[in-house]
Amino acid sequence: MQTLNFPTYEFRFKSNENKRYIFDIIRKKFVVLTPEEWVRQHAVRFLLQDRGYPQSLMNVEKRIQINHLTKRYDIVIYRPDGSIFLVVECKAPQVGLTQEVFDQIARYNLTL
């Protein structure tokens, strides 16, 4: 996988049926290792290890309703009272930060 602009972290991997998997410590399971998942797992580790957010207040791929459509946040950090504190949208390294990407986050923000 591509080197990212994050500190170096130790990850658990496995391979099965010509697919590579990475262990997600939040979901507590192996997930298919895609370029976006690679970014998401680095962001999770950064938030936990380098920024000190508690794992108990973090959720990955949280589903939400936006205008009667189900969408997913990549990473959500909650306040102790259960309200959303931080939303992280991850993109594969080769995905550009276009207006469409900014619009996606803006739509998520409207539901908060």
Language model segments and positions:
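A short, conserved, highly charged catalytic patch centered on acidic carboxylates
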Residues: 1-112
